Amino acid sequence: MQTDTYNSPFNARYASKEMQYIYSPDFKFKTWRKLWIALAEAEHELGLNVTQAQIDELKAHAEDINYDVAREREKLVRHDVMSHVYAYGVQCPTAKPIIHLGATSCYVGDNTDVITMREALLLIKKKLVNAIASVAKFADQYKDMPCLGFTHFQPAQPTTVGKRATLWLMDLVMDYEEVCHVLDTLMLLGSKGTTGTQASFLELFDGDHEKCKALDRKIAEKMGFKACFPVSGQTYARKLDTIVCNCLGLIAQSCCKFSNDLRLLQNLKEIEEPFEKNQIGSSAMAYKRNPMRSERIASLSRYVMIDALNPAWTASAQWFERTLDDSANKRVSVAEAFLATDGILDLYINVTSGLVVYPKVIHTRLMSELPFMATENIMMDAVKKGGDRQELHEKIRQHSMAAGAVVKVEGGKNDLVDRIAADPAFMTTKEEILAILKPENFVGRAPEQTADFLNEVVDPILAKEKDLLGVDVEINV
């Protein structure tokens, strides 16, 4: 790594090699050549003077790009597309006259952008499916383990560790559905010309409108898409970038919510993210086990969520058939949204596949609060024995306030059970109260809800996407 120039943290620290390649110059320029081949093939099939020999020559040099020639040419003409047209022509002298025939720069530029987003979304989808599988395994393993629930981060009715995980999982499932929808509806720009009218192609096809329409269909098919935009200016609608980045923003929201929950749970010492044997949590405090991966998820997630505003502003600021104030912004914002989301999902998979659960801490915290939550059950049991509901309610209120003071003022343990057992109005014993205080009696349908959700919603997704399961993620720091 160079140390005397700026290096993007996405390359050095966060994004995977796979995502970095998708947004590399090599992927871009090889896609340009694939698009030029698709254009030549379609024009040949529609009767233009493009020979099979020329197409074969283009295909022979689809991968071995002469970058040195393109770079030198760009110094002269200051135009990246025409520089690569020239370089391709140097390698393909027979095909040189028909390279880029009828097209504008946006033919390769915009279509490549859509193809790149598709490839990046497919990688995101793969990692999202693996994240779903990881959390599903955790939820199933701990679906029956009662834990204290929190609303407003204050003690609330118990749930289970696994049921809580299904909340993270539900978010990911919604993200998966959105990714699938976006992938299914992506369209290429096609071959639209300088203002979207296909005027140059109409001229090439001697006024044959059907051939112009067929050209778009053929290009879409050859590049693996269902369709091209039916209408456009010079570029595809920049709203598409917003749709894609919003989709990534949804994933960031889900991962950030998970990371926040986990950081709080780690503070409570109930669940921790993985911690390597030789990992150092703090340069000053050697005992520290900081949730650095979860914190990084939160940090990168904020970036992705805010970054989604860039394509929104860009789409809203385009004038008529096009302006170029989109280019510099989208070159950075869309790519980095994918690089960051890729890094987030790698961290998410890494963390969820190695979560450390502390059952005794979870049980102790639950039991410290459960007596308060069980007072309704205790009161009803006493009423069945002949007690006065109103009198018992007041006594429970008084005992609860006193027990709460012991915990919060004196720093003692919750003695509510002892207080109620000692009060003759309740006609009960400590043993009878403890029999009521079984955590599994207070979790409602949490275990069943978890099992149903996994069986009915998650498992069908994992079965459908079984070929995507199994991904090795590497966390650089």
Labelled PLM ranges:
Residues 303-389, 395-398:
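Long, amphipathic alpha-helical stalk/connector segments used for oligomerization, subunit docking
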Residues 163, 242-250, 377-385:
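Short, well-ordered beta-strand elements within core beta-sheets of diverse protein domains
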Residues 175, 179, 226, 233-327, ...:
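Glycine-rich anion/phosphate-binding loop at the beta-strand->alpha-helix junction
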Residues 78-81, 128-135, 139, 165-179, ...:
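Alpha-helical transition-metal enzyme core signature, strongest for iron centers
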Residues 1-199, 205-220, 281-282, 292-296, ...:
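A helix-coil-helix interface module used to build multimeric assemblies
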Residues 272, 395-402:
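Active/binding-pocket-proximal capping segment
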Residues 140-162, 272-288, 321-328, 353-373:
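Glycine-rich cofactor-pocket loops
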Residues 20-24, 69-71, 279-299, 321-336, ...:
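Short beta-alpha connecting loops at secondary-structure transitions
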